[in-house]
């Protein structure tokens, strides 16, 4: 049976290699931790239908390789993305220091209006932390990002990260800030929304005419 949904959003998962991007995606799609995860080569893909704010939304999620040698390949997948998880490892300052470059890529190659949530992953390794919550919060605030610390291992805040991003996109559609019909918006109407959009015209076409007698 074909899936029905109100909207389809294209999402990216971006950040340096070894931050747990593939594990976050796997936890969100399969609701379990991905054992023996290797570095992504190129891109990986997953999708899931979720309910957000009374709407049914299909998330198409592209997990991009973090290694520099794959950047030219993965950048082509940025186009037309509506949302992104920008991931660093709380136990690796090096991955945190590279966030600005990843964010620049997202806003340049996808869209200046892309909705981004910063994810400090591997929260379960808090004793090995190199990046404080306060420091990352400040970076998020300065760059107008949402922010959560996540654990792909335990699942903590993984679902919330994706849903929070989707909820923000829906709010921007409702406010008129984002237009699903604009080319490259990363948003498509699903069957449900298309039927609702067409309904007024159909109803208008068959509306009874007033009697002239």
From Swiss-Prot:
UniProt-annotated binding residues for Mg(2+): 22, 40, 63
Gene name tied to this protein: Rab4b
Residues the record lists as Cysteine methyl ester modifications: 213
Protein activity control: Regulated by guanine nucleotide exchange factors (GEFs) which promote the exchange of bound GDP for free GTP. Regulated by GTPase activating proteins (GAPs) which increase the GTP hydrolysis activity. Inhibited by GDP dissociation inhibitors (GDIs).
Lineage per the UniProt record: Eukaryota, Metazoa, Chordata, Craniata, Vertebrata
Single GO biological process annotation from the record: early endosome to Golgi transport
Molecular-function annotations in GO: G protein activity; GTP binding; GTPase activity
Cofactors that this protein relies on: Mg(2+)
Topology term for the membrane: Lipid-anchor
UniProt-recorded name of the protein: Ras-related protein Rab-4B
Catalytic activities: GTP + H2O = GDP + phosphate + H(+)
Residues with a covalently attached lipid (S-geranylgeranyl cysteine): 211, 213
Domain of life: Eukaryota
GO CC, one annotated term: plasma membrane
């Amino acid at each position: 049976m074909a899936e029905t949904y109100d909207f389809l959003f294209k999402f990216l998962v971006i950040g340096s290699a070894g931050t747990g991007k593939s594990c976050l995606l796997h936890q969100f799609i399969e609701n379990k931790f991905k054992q023996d995860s290797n570095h992504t080569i190129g891109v990986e893909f997953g999708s899931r239908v979720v309910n957000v704010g009374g709407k049914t939304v299909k998330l198409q999620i592209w997990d991009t390789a973090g290694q520099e040698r794959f950047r030219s390949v993965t950048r082509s997948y940025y186009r037309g993305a509506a949302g992104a998880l920008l991931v660093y490892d709380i136990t690796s300052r090096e991955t945190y220091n590279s966030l600005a470059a990843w964010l620049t890529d997202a806003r340049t190659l996808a869209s200046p209006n892309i909705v981004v949530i910063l994810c400090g992953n591997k929260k379960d390794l808090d004793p090995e932390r190199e990046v404080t919550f306060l420091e990352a919060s400040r970076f998020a605030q300065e760059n107008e990002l949402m922010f959560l610390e996540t654990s792909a291992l335990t699942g903590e805040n993984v679902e919330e990260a994706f849903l929070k991003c989707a909820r923000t996109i829906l709010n921007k559609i409702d406010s008129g800030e984002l237009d699903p019909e604009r080319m490259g918006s990363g948003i498509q109407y699903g069957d449900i929304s298309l039927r609702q959009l067409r309904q007024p015209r159909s109803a208008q076409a068959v509306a009874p005419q007033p009697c002239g007698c």
